Protein backbone atom coordinates (compact mmCIF):
# COMPACT_ATOMS: atom_id res chain seq x y z
CA UNK A 1 0.00 0.00 0.00
CA UNK A 2 1.21 3.50 -0.87
CA UNK A 3 0.68 6.10 1.83
CA UNK A 4 1.22 9.84 1.57
CA UNK A 5 2.12 11.57 4.83
CA UNK A 6 1.00 15.18 5.24
CA UNK A 7 2.18 16.57 8.55
CA UNK A 8 1.19 19.84 10.10
CA UNK A 9 -0.43 21.79 12.87
CA UNK A 10 -3.76 21.97 11.01
CA UNK A 11 -4.52 25.12 12.99
CA UNK A 12 -7.02 25.22 11.37
CA UNK A 13 -7.36 22.53 8.73
CA UNK A 14 -8.78 23.88 5.46
CA UNK A 15 -9.75 23.05 1.90
CA UNK A 16 -6.20 23.48 0.61
CA UNK A 17 -5.09 20.57 2.84
CA UNK A 18 -7.87 18.50 1.28
CA UNK A 19 -7.03 19.66 -2.26
CA UNK A 20 -3.32 18.87 -1.79
CA UNK A 21 -4.27 15.40 -0.53
CA UNK A 22 -6.60 14.64 -3.44
CA UNK A 23 -3.99 16.00 -5.87
CA UNK A 24 -1.30 13.79 -4.28
CA UNK A 25 -3.55 10.71 -4.33
CA UNK A 26 -3.94 11.11 -8.08
CA UNK A 27 -0.51 12.38 -9.15
CA UNK A 28 1.50 10.06 -6.89
CA UNK A 29 -0.86 7.10 -7.39
CA UNK A 30 -1.34 6.73 -3.64
CA UNK A 31 -3.86 4.53 -1.85
CA UNK A 32 -4.21 6.78 1.20
CA UNK A 33 -3.03 10.07 2.65
CA UNK A 34 -2.53 10.30 6.39
CA UNK A 35 -2.78 13.73 7.97
CA UNK A 36 -0.34 13.72 10.88
CA UNK A 37 -1.70 16.38 13.23
CA UNK A 38 1.28 17.45 15.32
CA UNK A 39 1.07 18.34 19.01
CA UNK A 40 3.19 21.40 18.18
CA UNK A 41 5.56 22.69 15.53
CA UNK A 42 9.11 23.13 16.90
CA UNK A 43 9.75 25.93 14.38
CA UNK A 44 6.67 28.01 15.21
CA UNK A 45 5.22 29.90 18.14
CA UNK A 46 2.58 27.50 19.43
CA UNK A 47 0.92 30.08 21.70
CA UNK A 48 -2.27 30.24 19.62
CA UNK A 49 -2.37 26.52 18.94
CA UNK A 50 -5.80 25.00 19.52
CA UNK A 51 -6.09 21.73 21.43
CA UNK A 52 -4.94 18.65 19.53
CA UNK A 53 -8.35 16.96 19.85
CA UNK A 54 -10.07 20.06 18.45
CA UNK A 55 -7.70 20.25 15.48
CA UNK A 56 -8.06 16.52 14.76
CA UNK A 57 -11.87 16.71 14.90
CA UNK A 58 -11.87 19.70 12.55
CA UNK A 59 -9.47 17.87 10.23
CA UNK A 60 -11.86 14.91 10.00
CA UNK A 61 -14.66 17.25 8.92
CA UNK A 62 -12.53 19.01 6.32
CA UNK A 63 -10.97 15.82 4.90
CA UNK A 64 -14.35 14.30 4.04
CA UNK A 65 -12.85 11.46 2.00
CA UNK A 66 -12.34 7.86 3.13
CA UNK A 67 -8.86 7.84 1.57
CA UNK A 68 -7.73 10.63 3.91
CA UNK A 69 -7.09 9.43 7.45
CA UNK A 70 -6.44 11.67 10.43
CA UNK A 71 -3.79 10.66 12.96
CA UNK A 72 -2.40 12.12 16.17
CA UNK A 73 0.48 9.63 16.05
CA UNK A 74 3.14 12.12 17.14
CA UNK A 75 1.28 12.71 20.39
CA UNK A 76 0.99 8.95 20.94
CA UNK A 77 4.70 8.31 20.39
CA UNK A 78 5.77 11.46 22.23
CA UNK A 79 7.46 13.52 19.53
CA UNK A 80 7.06 16.70 17.52
CA UNK A 81 9.78 15.84 15.03
CA UNK A 82 9.16 14.42 11.56
CA UNK A 83 12.38 12.38 11.64
CA UNK A 84 11.18 10.49 14.73
CA UNK A 85 7.74 9.93 13.20
CA UNK A 86 9.16 8.55 9.97
CA UNK A 87 11.57 6.27 11.82
CA UNK A 88 8.68 4.96 13.92
CA UNK A 89 6.47 4.32 10.88
CA UNK A 90 9.23 2.60 8.94
CA UNK A 91 9.88 0.25 11.89
CA UNK A 92 6.22 -0.47 12.63
CA UNK A 93 4.82 -0.57 9.10
CA UNK A 94 7.72 -1.76 6.97
CA UNK A 95 5.44 -3.21 4.27
CA UNK A 96 3.88 0.17 3.53
CA UNK A 97 5.50 2.57 1.08
CA UNK A 98 5.49 6.11 2.41
CA UNK A 99 5.86 9.45 0.63
CA UNK A 100 6.30 12.65 2.63
CA UNK A 101 4.14 15.44 1.18
CA UNK A 102 4.89 19.09 1.81
CA UNK A 103 4.21 22.47 0.28
CA UNK A 104 6.92 24.53 -1.37
CA UNK A 105 6.80 26.87 1.63
CA UNK A 106 8.09 23.99 3.76
CA UNK A 107 10.82 23.09 1.27
CA UNK A 108 12.05 26.69 1.54
CA UNK A 109 12.80 26.12 5.24
CA UNK A 110 13.33 22.34 5.23
CA UNK A 111 17.03 22.85 6.06
CA UNK A 112 15.90 24.14 9.48
CA UNK A 113 14.05 20.91 10.36
CA UNK A 114 15.68 18.59 12.86
CA UNK A 115 17.58 15.85 10.97
CA UNK A 116 16.33 17.03 7.59
CA UNK A 117 18.99 15.05 5.72
CA UNK A 118 17.91 11.93 7.60
CA UNK A 119 14.27 12.54 6.60
CA UNK A 120 15.27 12.86 2.94
CA UNK A 121 17.33 9.66 3.18
CA UNK A 122 14.46 7.69 4.72
CA UNK A 123 11.40 8.53 2.64
CA UNK A 124 10.70 9.86 -0.87
CA UNK A 125 9.23 13.36 -0.84
CA UNK A 126 6.67 15.18 -2.95
CA UNK A 127 6.75 18.97 -2.87
CA UNK A 128 3.59 20.75 -4.00
CA UNK A 129 4.08 24.11 -5.68
CA UNK A 130 2.77 27.08 -3.66
CA UNK A 131 3.07 30.18 -5.86
CA UNK A 132 4.62 32.69 -5.35
CA UNK A 133 7.05 30.64 -3.25
CA UNK A 134 8.35 28.48 -6.12
CA UNK A 135 11.61 30.29 -6.85
CA UNK A 136 12.55 30.63 -3.18
CA UNK A 137 11.75 26.97 -2.49
CA UNK A 138 13.69 25.58 -5.44
CA UNK A 139 16.72 27.70 -4.52
CA UNK A 140 16.64 26.91 -0.81
CA UNK A 141 19.59 25.10 0.81
CA UNK A 142 17.77 21.74 1.05
CA UNK A 143 16.55 21.86 -2.56
CA UNK A 144 20.08 22.59 -3.76
CA UNK A 145 21.57 19.84 -1.57
CA UNK A 146 19.01 17.32 -2.86
CA UNK A 147 18.97 18.51 -6.49
CA UNK A 148 20.58 15.36 -7.88
CA UNK A 149 17.77 13.24 -6.37
CA UNK A 150 14.97 15.24 -7.98
CA UNK A 151 12.85 13.25 -10.41
CA UNK A 152 11.05 14.66 -13.43
CA UNK A 153 7.44 15.51 -12.63
CA UNK A 154 6.34 12.96 -15.24
CA UNK A 155 7.72 10.23 -12.91
CA UNK A 156 5.59 11.31 -9.93
CA UNK A 157 3.43 8.19 -10.13
CA UNK A 158 6.49 6.02 -9.43
CA UNK A 159 7.82 8.05 -6.50
CA UNK A 160 6.45 5.67 -3.84
CA UNK A 161 8.42 2.83 -5.46
CA UNK A 162 11.71 4.72 -5.40
CA UNK A 163 14.31 4.33 -2.69
CA UNK A 164 15.08 7.52 -0.82
CA UNK A 165 16.52 9.98 -1.36
CA UNK A 166 14.12 10.86 -4.15
CA UNK A 167 11.77 13.78 -4.60
CA UNK A 168 9.50 15.39 -7.11
CA UNK A 169 8.18 18.93 -7.46
CA UNK A 170 4.50 18.91 -8.39
CA UNK A 171 2.96 21.82 -10.28
CA UNK A 172 -0.56 22.47 -11.46
CA UNK A 173 -2.36 23.01 -8.17
CA UNK A 174 -2.76 26.72 -7.50
CA UNK A 175 -3.90 27.40 -3.94
CA UNK A 176 -3.57 30.53 -1.87
CA UNK A 177 -5.26 29.34 1.34
CA UNK A 178 -3.11 29.06 4.44
CA UNK A 179 -3.85 28.27 8.08
CA UNK A 180 -2.24 31.57 9.07
CA UNK A 181 -4.74 33.45 6.91
CA UNK A 182 -7.63 31.60 8.55
CA UNK A 183 -6.76 32.65 12.09
CA UNK A 184 -8.05 35.80 13.75
CA UNK A 185 -5.55 38.02 15.61
CA UNK A 186 -6.64 36.41 18.89
CA UNK A 187 -5.84 32.92 17.52
CA UNK A 188 -9.45 31.88 17.04
CA UNK A 189 -10.36 30.33 13.72
CA UNK A 190 -12.29 32.06 11.00
CA UNK A 191 -14.97 29.94 9.38
CA UNK A 192 -13.44 26.79 7.91
Curated annotation (Swiss-Prot):
InterPro entries for this protein:
Cyt_trans-like, NadD/NMNAT, Rossmann-like_a/b/a_fold
Molecular function via GO:
ATP binding; nicotinate-nucleotide adenylyltransferase activity
Q: What is its EC number?
A: 2.7.7.18
Q: GO BP, one example?
A: NAD biosynthetic process
Tell me which UniProt keywords the record has, alphabetically: ATP-binding, NAD, Nucleotide-binding, Nucleotidyltransferase, Pyridine nucleotide biosynthesis, Transferase
> Which reaction equations make up its catalytic activity?
nicotinate beta-D-ribonucleotide + ATP + H(+) = deamido-NAD(+) + diphosphate
Q: Which domain of life is it from?
A: Bacteria
**Carries keyword Cell cycle?**
no
Q: In which pathway does it act?
A: Cofactor biosynthesis; NAD(+) biosynthesis; deamido-NAD(+) from nicotinate D-ribonucleotide: step 1/1
Q: Which NCBIfam families match?
A: nicotinate (nicotinamide) nucleotide adenylyltransferase (TIGR00482), PRK00071.2-2 (NF000843), PRK00071.2-4 (NF000845), PRK00071.2-5 (NF000846)
What the record says about family reads: Belongs to the NadD family.
What is this protein for, i.e. what is its function?
Catalyzes the reversible adenylation of nicotinate mononucleotide (NaMN) to nicotinic acid adenine dinucleotide (NaAD).
PANTHER family reported for this sequence:
NICOTINATE-NUCLEOTIDE ADENYLYLTRANSFERASE-RELATED (PTHR39321), PHOSPHOPANTETHEINE ADENYLYLTRANSFERASE (PTHR39321:SF3)
Name recorded for this polypeptide: Probable nicotinate-nucleotide adenylyltransferase
Q: By which gene is this protein encoded? A: nadD
Amino acid sequence: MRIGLLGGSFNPPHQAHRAISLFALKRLQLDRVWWLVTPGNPLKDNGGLHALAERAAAARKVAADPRIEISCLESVIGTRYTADTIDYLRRRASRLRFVWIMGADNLAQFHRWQKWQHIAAQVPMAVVDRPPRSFRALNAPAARALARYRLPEADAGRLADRAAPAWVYLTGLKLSLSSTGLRNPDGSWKSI
